[in-house]
Each structure stands twice: as C-alpha cells, then as structure tokens.
Amino acid sequence: MNRNKLKEGGNIELSLSYRPPFDLEAMLGFLAYRAIPGVEAVTAHSYARTFRLEGLAGHFQAFFEPRSHNIRVYVSYGETRHLGRIIERIRALFDVRADSAQIDEFLVQDSQLAPMVRRFPGLRVPGCWSGFELAVRAILGQQVTVKAASTLVSRVAERYGEAYEGDVEGLNYTFPEPARLVVADLDGMGIVGVRIAAIRAVAEQLERGELDIGGGMDTETFVPAIRKIKGVGEWTAQYIAMRALSDPNAFP
C-alpha cells in the first residue's frame, strides 16, 4: 500500500510498505558498492538517484523505516501523471513485493542453504531503475572487479549524462539515454573495443525497438535476443534478466 501527498517545493511524498523480514543492510550495501557517482547517492538508511522519464529529468530519495516496515519516498518530477510508473520502478528496484518470510521458509528446507537463510533473513534481489543503465553496467563489468566497473560506468555517465540541478547533494546528472550512447565516442575511457561495440549495439536495438529491457520481453525472448550481440554472453544476459526483468528464475 502507498500513500502520497504534495510537499512544499513540489516534491511528492510517498509511503511504500513492505512485508518483513527485509535485509536492508544487504540491499543498500549492494547498491552503495555499485552506485554511480553523480547519478546515485546511498547511505546506511537511504537511496537517492536522478532519472529521466518521457524526456523529463527528476530525482527521488528513499528513506527506509524498518520499525514501521515502510519506505518513505520523496519524488521531484514535473509530471504527476507518470507517478504510477515511478512508484512501480521504485518497488521493483527494492524488490518490495517479495514475500521474504515465505521465500525463507521454503529455502530453509535445504540443508546447505538453511544456515545462510537463518543468518541473513529477508535477502531480496536488487532491481534497477533503468534496464539500459543496468545493461551498460553489466557489459562494463565483464571480467573486471566491481570497483573497476564502477569507475568505467561513472566515466560514461559523467561525460555523456545530462547536467541536473536538484536539492539532493551529490546528484549532478542523469544517466545517458540510449540515443546518446549510439553516437557517443567511448574511445580513450579505458573500455575495450568489443564492449564499446556491445554497448552501442544494445543502444541501437533499443532505439529501433528490436530489444526491450523494460518488461516488454520475457526472459525466454530477451536472453536469446541480447545474446546475438557480440560481447554479451549468457552470464550478462541472465544477470540483466534477473535485475531488470525481475525474473526469479534467471540464473547468472
């Protein structure tokens, strides 16, 4: 259930409820380690990011309130008619709809998984705001450390993202849209040629409507389609399906 109201300054306040348990430390830790400077800002209890929807830029902040099992969200965006879409993306990002108690109850029946489930109850699968952004990150993350991938994706965002001015410190630009990276010169940024070509191919196919990483394709259709792109292997395709398509059966 969510409630919303317009706050002074044009921000909309939302309250998204979730069913416990929820391992907030694991969720925010995962997102923080992979945060794109200037696009995302993560603390021990909050997550914030810029976004672009239907050509209009905005941002949101999410504050986790474990005692009340709520996520308090402030959205700054000029078109309230798209608020429903924004809420759904935020829910998917934090895997809000997961019934963690039921999932843990099932997994604890496995003798090998049981100790981990008992130690870390309420683990959820982090989603994403943008399937394209995630695909770029996944491609750049091939055969390198998470830290190295974060460095590369931050270079792309800083050079080709649109400047953004909001009221949240650390949010300075939006991640570049596919059309921007179709023509972007990514040489000299430390990215190998095959990955540059893969990013450009994904962007081109999204622009032509041949690929959909926003829920318009199921995993059975999406994985073979994106795997046709040179430089995108099974792990990358399954990872994108797991986080962008919210497929519980995807297995990177």
Please give the residue ranges for each predicted region:
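HhH-family (HhH-GPD) DNA N-glycosylase catalytic core used in base-excision repair
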Residues: M1-P252
